[in-house]
Amino acid sequence: MPELPEVETTRRGIDPVITGQTLRRLVVREPRMRWPIPADLPSLLTDRPVLATGRRGKYLLLRFEHGVQIVHLGMSGSLRRVAMDEAPRKHDHVDWVFDHAILRLHDPRRFGAVLWHPNTDGPVEAHPLLIGLGIEPFDPRFDGKWLHDHFRDKRVAVKQALLAGHAVVGVGNIYASECLFRAGIDPRTPAGKLSRPRCERLAQAVRATLADALASGGSTLRDYVGASGEPGAYFAIHAAVYERAGLACRVCGTPIRRLVQGQRATYFCPHCQKR
């Protein structure tokens, strides 16, 4: 699934292309996404300028004068710029057509979303998909104290607590394993048992890992590409544990282990990461 670095990389790629430009047409070839695309959405947005782009967690935000379009890339989706004369391929479900550019949503599994939040419903942060999200990892308020306060009394494993997104957003399955390795924390450790210093190390690891991923254009394991069609390079360059089961830890040489938590694969070093 595209995680925060992939979504932010996409936003940075499309922002100079569409901000200030008028959307001439929204072409919906397949409305049956995770939630149905509203039938009136093309008429609501035709000939309307994009005022700004944004992101909340893993959601892309396209701001118009009368509301905000919420776009989620699902499990395997991508949003990229294509040539004006490029024919759609299989699984190319939505086009944003501007005078000199087309953005195309490709989503083989149709787990993504293209939704609309009118200004009359209040700020977009109050949308049901966004209102329960935790703090952004690069918010100055996010630190060890923040994590320690939000993890207090939680019996769930720290890996699961990160994935839930209530304490901090954007740490998906790939980066959760990487962050915990960087912090030296066993992913099975109950979140509520982490000391304040260990929470501080984890907060620092989250920021550093996501910053590295952003600098590398995100991660590409199977489907993700950026706005220009380029794959992310983080996984090939930086991955310490993810999908390295049985291989030697890059730090101590101990074989990396794999386990399943909440039906998701977790990777860790049993020597470097302590409970």
Swiss-Prot record:
Cofactor(s) required for function per UniProt: Zn(2+)
Gene: mutM
ZnF (FPG-type) ranges: 240-274
Taxonomy of the source species: Bacteria, Pseudomonadati, Pseudomonadota, Betaproteobacteria, Burkholderiales
Record-stated family: Belongs to the FPG family.
Record text on subunit structure and interactions: Monomer.
Keywords: DNA damage, DNA repair, DNA-binding, Glycosidase, Hydrolase, Lyase, Metal-binding, Multifunctional enzyme, Zinc, Zinc-finger
PANTHER family in UniProt: FORMAMIDOPYRIMIDINE-DNA GLYCOSYLASE
EC number: 3.2.2.23, 4.2.99.18
Keyword Hydrolase listed: yes
A GO term, aspect molecular function: 8-oxo-7,8-dihydroguanine DNA N-glycosylase activity
Active site: 2 (schiff-base intermediate with dna), 3 (proton donor), 58 (proton donor), 264 (proton donor)
GO biological process, one term: base-excision repair
Entry function: Involved in base excision repair of DNA damaged by oxidation or by mutagenic agents. Acts as a DNA glycosylase that recognizes and removes damaged bases. Has a preference for oxidized purines, such as 7,8-dihydro-8-oxoguanine (8-oxoG). Has AP (apurinic/apyrimidinic) lyase activity and introduces nicks in the DNA strand. Cleaves the DNA backbone by beta-delta elimination to generate a single-strand break at the site of the removed base with both 3'- and 5'-phosphates.
Full protein name: Formamidopyrimidine-DNA glycosylase
The UniProt record lists the keyword DNA-binding: yes
Cofactor: how bound: Binds 1 zinc ion per subunit.
